[in-house]
Structure formats: structure tokens, C-alpha cells
A protein has these predicted regions:
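Short active-site neighborhood of thiol/selenol oxidoreductases, capturing the structured segment around
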Residues: 34-48, 53-54, 72
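A short beta-strand-turn-helix
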Residues: 23-37, 200-203
Length: 240
């Protein structure tokens, strides 16, 4: 089932490398005790820079957990709103999409992933990401930690193990690994979660053209696969 809101998106949006973060609004005042940092992330599950950004965000959180508590919410974005549900060869798809830039881009991603201790895998299929976003929404109903951990499982599978992001078995198994209950039943009905994904797309992602895109405590907004220190600076600025 196609999302109505996707008709307003260009066929291909942008998966972004890092750029310098800008403070977009005044920081929230300090509160007694540990400050809660709320992070909203717009991403697509086939965007490698979204995974890079997540890993760097995790590093920043680990380095800051003695100062802050964190709540992370993931929201949908569609790099290719017309991608086929049945899946197509990943390498061939990106070779066609990027043309002469493909080889250089893949070399760059391989280098970046190795810097994270991972091997970038271009095998397998790519395609429509709606079911993965439906599942991420469903996971969020069972807790932000489970949702965050699910995003990790999906990214590990798709980017390093050649798993297809639209494969039902892979989605359900990823949900099982992070303790999400009822995933198979939820995904069985193709209408489940579509309305909510549409609403989140409109609320969090309709104004952006590339991902990953972060909003910290509703104040600081930046995009791209940022290094950990960018996140840490944003946490500190918001606390002052």
C-alpha cells in the first residue's frame, strides 16, 4: 500500500555525509539532577550514513550517560518512494542510480564502515522500506530502547550481512532479537502502521530533503553522519 504523503517527495532524496551542525533555537534551561535529552532522528533503513550517524550517536551517549538520561525516537523517511517491494539487486540498482560515481562512493563507504569495525556489504537486494518503518513504529510502542535496538539490528543485517530490508522473515527475526513481541502478527496486515508512518512522515520529515536528520530537545537541528563530538557538544549546549 503506497503512502499518500510520499507523492510529495522527489523519487530520490539524499543520504547525507556529515556537515557542520548549527544551533537552531535557544537552549532549554537546566533542571535539577540529570537532564533528559530527547533525540528525534529521521532516517531511512537503506541509508548508510544513517547507520554511521547512529553508531556515532551511540558513542556520544556512552560518553555522556553519567551526565544525562536519553530518550531516542526514530522517524521514517524514504530515500526512494517508488522503490519496488519485491526487491532488486542492490549493486546493480546503485550502479544505475549513481553511474560513474558508484565506484568512488562504495570505496568511501567501505572505508567509513571499516572505521567502525564493520565490513560494508553490497550483496543481496534493496527495495521498498515501508515494512521496516512500520516495524520501527511498532517497536516504539513497546519502548524507545527496543526501537533503538531494532534499528541497529536492521542496519547490521542490511549493510553488513546482505539481508533484504523488505524480507518479512528478516524483519521478524530482528524484532525477536531485541525482545519485540507480536511483530509477525503486526506485519501480516499490510495496513497496520501505515497511517502512523504517514503521520510521522508529515510531522518530522516533510520539511527535510536528506537524512540522517537529528533534533535534540526540539532545539538543535543538524544532518549527516556526524562524529560523536558534534552530538556531545549539542548535549552540553542544551544543558547550559
Amino acid at each position: 500500500m503506497r503512502l499518500a504523503r510520499l507523492q510529495n517527495l522527489p523519487p530520490f532524496c539524499t543520504c547525507r555525509e556529515s556537515r557542520y551542525a548549527k544551533v537552531m533555537a535557544q537552549s532549554v534551561s537546566n533542571t535539577p539532577g540529570k537532564k533528559l535529552v530527547r533525540i528525534d532522528v529521521s532516517s531511512d533503513t537503506v541509508c548508510p550514513w544513517c547507520f554511521v550517524g547512529k553508531r556515532n550517536l551511540d558513542k556520544a551517549i556512552a560518553a555522556s550517560k553519567d551526565q544525562f538520561d536519553f530518550e531516542i525516537r526514530w522517524h521514517p523517511f524514504f530515500l526512494d518512494s517508488s522503490a519496488p517491494k519485491e526487491g532488486v539487486n542492490k549493486r546493480e540498482f546503485y550502479e544505475k542510480k549513481f553511474g560513474s560515481r558508484f565506484t568512488g562512493m562504495m570505496a568511501r563507504m567501505t572505508e567509513v564502515f571499516r572505521g567502525l569495525g564493520l565490513e560494508y556489504d553490497m550483496s543481496g537486494l534493496t527495495g521498498n522500506t515501508l515494512d521496516s518503518h512500520r516495524l520501527i513504529y511498532f517497536a516504539g510502542k513497546q519502548g524507545s530502547d527496543k526501537q533503538h535496538n531494532l534499528v541497529e539490528e536492521l542496519c547490521i543485517g542490511y549493510f553488513t550481512q546482505g539481508k533484504y530490508i523488505g524480507d518479512r522473515e528478516f524483519l521478524v527475526e530482528s524484532a525477536r532479537k531485541v525482545g519485540i513481541e507480536g511483530a509477525a502478527e503486526f506485519l501480516e496486515d499490510p495496513n497496520n502502521g501505515v497511517k502512523e508512518v504517514n503521520e510521522e512522515l508529515e510531522k518530522y520529515s516533510s520539511h527535510i530533503t536528506g537524512v540522517p536528520y537529528y533534533v535534540i530537545n526540539g532545539n538543535h537541528k543538524f544532518s549527516g553522519g556526524q562524529p560523536p563530538e558534534v552530538f556531545q557538544r549539542a548535549f552540553q549546549v542544551d544543558a547550559n
